[in-house]
Regions:
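ANL superfamily adenylate-forming
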Residues: 1-13, 122, 133
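Short beta-strand->loop structural element characteristic of the AMP-binding/adenylate-forming
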Residues: 1-5, 33-36, 85-91
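Conserved pre-ATP/AMP-binding loop-to-beta segment of ANL
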Residues: 6-24, 57-60
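Conserved AMP-binding A3 loop
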Residues: 20-47, 54
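Conserved small/polar residues in nucleotide/adenosyl-binding loops
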Residues: 25, 182-183
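AMP-binding/adenylate-forming
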Residues: 39-44, 60-116
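Gly/Ser/Thr-rich phosphate-binding loop
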Residues: 120-175
Length: 183
């Protein structure tokens, strides 16, 4: 299903009067499972992230991940909570290809999207102009982390899962507040 259709379906479920909605685990530790989660807890997670990152009404945010998983759903919930201007792209390995000159305040990507984006000069420039980038959904290898350290914007690695309604930890990857992690 194209992402715009997924988005409309998610918004319909979000605005439904039920205090719950269904999400699907990624299956990274076994068979993917469906589970019901409370919308108010999703809003609380969105509030914590938006407040911590200083996101506010009108900031441009990028949705470039599938809405069948919690990461994509939480980008929408953060946008609803904070009044972000959500830009929607079909999930792909190159989310900033043919993007144009619209600067982004906030984006969330998986490591492969970041890796691919950094390989294409025009896409790399757009990524470096994105004020805040969070990277989740998988480990960031040492070579990619080293490349990210050189980026001028604010980049975090996230740790979380469906059961925690997105990330529960952020680790700064670059800038003076960067936190090194050795394996």
């Amino acid at each position: 299903m194209p992402i715009q259709e997924d988005l409309q379906a998610f918004l319909a479920e979000w605005h439904d009067p039920s205090p719950f909605l269904e999400v699907q685990t990624s299956g990274s530790t076994g068979t993917p499972k469906r589970m019901r989660v409370r919308k108010d807890r999703m809003l609380n997670s969105a509030r914590l992230t938006c407040d911590y990152l200083g996101l506010k009404k009108g900031d441009k945010a990028l949705l470039c991940m599938p809405l069948r998983y919690i990461a994509g759903k939480m980008m929408v919930v953060r946008s609803l909570y904070a009044g972000l201007d959500l830009k929607v792209r079909e999930p792909s390995g190159h989310p900033l290809a043919d993007w144009g000159d619209t600067p982004l305040r906030f984006a969330a990507m998986i490591p492969l999207q970041v890796y691919n984006t950094l390989r294409v000069p025009e896409e790399r420039k757009r990524l470096e102009q994105t004020d805040i980038l969070i990277i989740g959904g998988g480990a960031i290898d040492a070579a990619l982390e080293q490349e990210i350290r050189q980026m001028p914007n604010t980049v975090y690695s996230t740790y979380g899962m469906t059961e925690t309604l997105s990330h529960v930890a952020l680790r700064r990857l670059n800038g003076p507040e960067a936190v090194s992690y050795t394996h």
